[in-house]
Amino acid sequence: MQRFTALYASLPEQSRGRLVPEAESPPRTPFARDRDRIIHSSAFRRLKHKTQVFVYHEGDHYRTRLTHSIEVAQVARSIARALGLDEDLTEALALAHDLGHTPFGHAGERELDRLMRPYGGFDHNAQSLRIVTRLERRYAAFDGLNLSWETLEGLVKHNGPLVDDEGNPRGLYRERGLPEAIVEYAAMHDLQLASYASAEAQVAAISDDIAYNAHDTDDGLRAGLFDVIDLGDVPLAGEALATVLKTWPGIDTQRAIHETVRRVISDMIADVIAETRRRAEALAPTSADAVRALGRPLVGFSAQMAEKNRTLQSFLSGKMYKHPQVTGIMERAQRVVRDLFEAYLADQSLLPANWREESFTDDRSRFARQVCDFIAGMTDRFALDQHKRMFDLDPLFR
């Protein structure tokens, strides 16, 4: 397949650079170098034992944050290649998008956010930025990974602008304001928070949706939270299943699940490519900055696919995320986060020595953020082990 570069692609030779200037690293482009730094980071490795929906001990074949991120990167590269975008930047953003997630999935995040409300709250996007700009401490010349402007911009804005043209917070941040980590970093390295991100960042974001829905369908079926028959009335998944059963009558259930998920992913990818090409032809952006200035997303589903996607998400919410088997475990997982946070905040000597060094301060908000950083970086397994060591019980099984 012959490669081409879209007029609106991000060009590595035109990168706005890094906060701390560095010599180039041939033959890698700046974006390829970003991807490599993300892959070699401690935070990326820890994703192996962080939950998507199931706590890590539930089964070896269910997705974790790591397997999910790899799958998002595969989808994202496929779309980027078809659209003529920079594949390295797209992949870097896909691999980094979940770095800031807590143990125990969204349940852990909700509990940590609740506990941190008096101190500025918790936001996984802001935490991802903290990790790559501050918390990873591997290099002699700087904290963080010193990623390029384009990667940081995409990491922060992959779901759209954070503020309006007057600087007022938008969307999820309208009521609570922007997280301090984003405000502080943007003041040093302007991320243009009022504009959309690059097409590559938008591809990474929609690839997350594609992988999430398709693979949670797979995991939910394997876990027995719903069965193949339940998919029959769900647009997209039901259509894919009908095609599979018609093509291979008598196919066994496991193969039917795999073939159905394959078709869901393929159909969504094809739709994004076709719809984005249609928008690009109509809007005619001629550069990456032109994409940022469009005032609307360039990358997206068609109206029909967007509706099917919403229906599938609603189905998964009812059948899977709200299933008693899942919610019961998540409620107990939230207790782990709560117990650990309260214990560390009350007695900083419980923290490891390398996390204690900066903790002796009269600034309780700063100390709470230190505790938050420590807990947010935990894997499910480490959080459970710490809880058992400190409280001599395993709350997931009581």
Regions found by a protein language model. Give the residues of each.
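Helix N-cap / loop-to-helix initiation motif
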Residues: 85-86, 105
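Hydrophobic alpha-helical membrane segments of integral membrane proteins
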Residues: 89-94
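Alpha-helix boundary/capping segments in eukaryotic regulatory proteins
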Residues: 82-85, 100
